[in-house]
Design a protein with these regions (language model features):
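C-terminal regulatory/interaction module of P-loop NTP-utilizing enzymes
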Residues: 1-169
Length: 169
């Protein structure tokens, strides 16, 4: 159902992750996962990075309500896990924003493929970097695919930026 799918913040590329196998297991001492899970639970529950993300992030014009919320929640989660001490450079932050947008774009592309009209055709999600340039984030696996190049349905008018487009706002 598209209504449920639209509520996903990110669609992670599982095909880019290594398959779990016995070579990742050890016979030596290891980190107990219960302890790690409890540490992450405490860290994630008692730290709020959403406000920081909201003030540092400038998103493009095709980013709509659920897109914005999903992108910001994903970036806040990255900051909690990767920078629990609180410091993050602008380059790192922009990388996290780009990856969050890429994941959200995957959700939008899948919804656009399943919907007969142009409700989800605005897949050109972007952000404004620290130099003031608008960066449209593409998914590597769909670059050059007709449904991504031209997400509009015939006969419906939707303003969509060109694939890979970057320009000053």
């Amino acid at each position: 159902d598209l209504a449920v799918m639209d509520r996903f913040c990110i669609y992670m590329p599982g095909w880019e992750m290594p398959k779990n196998s016995s070579e990742y297991l050890t016979n030596n001492y290891g980190f107990i996962t219960d302890y790690l899970a409890e540490a992450f639970h405490y860290q994630l529950k008692h730290t709020n990075r959403y406000e920081e993300v909201s003030t540092r992030t400038k998103l493009g014009k095709f980013v709509e309500g659920r897109d914005e919320k999903g992108i910001k929640k994903t970036v806040a989660a990255y900051l909690k896990m990767l920078h629990p001490h609180g410091e993050c450079s602008d380059e790192e932050f922009e990388e996290y924003v780009a990856y969050a947008i890429e994941g959200r774009r995957r959700v939008k592309e899948q919804m656009n493929k399943r919907k007969p009209d142009d409700e989800f055709a605005n897949i050109g999600l972007s952000f404004i970097n620290t130099q003031g340039e608008e960066i449209v984030v593409d998914c590597p696996e769909t670059m050059g695919v007709e449904a991504t190049i031209n997400p509009k349905k015939p006969g419906v008018n939707v303003d969509v930026p060109e694939e890979g487009q970057s320009h000053d706002p």
